[in-house]
Amino acid sequence: MKGISLYSVVPVRAEARESAEQNTQMLFGETRTILEQKPRWNRIKLDNDGQEGWIDAKMLAPMTEEEYTSYSKAYASAAMVSFPMVFAVSENNQQTIPLTAGTRLTNYQDGRFEILGVPFRIDASMVITQPIELNEQNLLQTVRFFLNIPYLWGGKNAMGMDCSGFTQIIMSLFGKRLLRNASEQATRGTARADITQVKAGDLVFFNHEGLNDGAANPQKITHVGIAIDSTRVIHCSGRVKVEKLDSTGIYNIEQGGYSHHLASIIDSESLL
């Protein structure tokens, strides 16, 4: 059975209870497949990145196969919210709904979009209809609005993001479709030989947090950021921020030491 989120952000949890860990979030307009049903909860698989988890059943709207097929075609080429947050207004009842960056807007044209037959208005200056060209200038212009968004485990919206939620949303604005977790994102694309080859938009992965705790495990990716150039990275650790990057890792000026150990670099041009 298929379904869709008509809420701004819906938590996807590790277990079927409100107090369970949040693994990820489902944004407005994202679809899912139901894998298992309980009286109050559905175990689902997200269509965009394959993440699985439990969602409160009342926070999802069912879709017929016909609706899903038609919507999926429109979703693939949909416009996208490019700013951290914007309000859309339903033309049916004039109620507003906050939408966050990365939210796709189907059937969009000139500040209006439609989802399952419901028309909405939105500020056109906060919407992109084509992916942004990935270069240093455009990357800096885009991410400056996301600075200081706080860290939230499982988050991928303007009120809280984790490291891989941040990279997934930002890179989607540049037409790159990433998996959800840092360890998964590290498995796609072509690796750079070393940091001297880094270009703006490359994904930078780290395998250890806190270099004083012993040797890093090269098999365990724990963190990801986006390179601005070979000396700077923007990432979410505590908050979204720009920090110094070198062949050792991320140097935290506030702490006076390295916070993350460099593991690998993925060429953004090799990502789809």
Language-model regions, residue ranges each:
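Catalytic cysteine-centered active-site loop
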Residues: 151-200
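Hydrophobic/aromatic-rich core segments of domains that either
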Residues: 196-213
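Conserved "cap/hinge" positions at secondary-structure junctions
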Residues: 36, 109, 207-208, 237
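Boundary regions of SH3-family modules and the immediately adjacent low-complexity/disordered segments
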Residues: 1-7, 17, 24, 30-31, ...
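Short, conserved secondary-structure segments in the cores of folded domains
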Residues: 22, 95, 191-194
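Aromatic- and glycine-rich peptidoglycan recognition patches
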Residues: 61-62, 128-129, 192, 218-223, ...
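Hydrophobic beta-strand signal
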Residues: 33, 103-106, 205, 226, ...
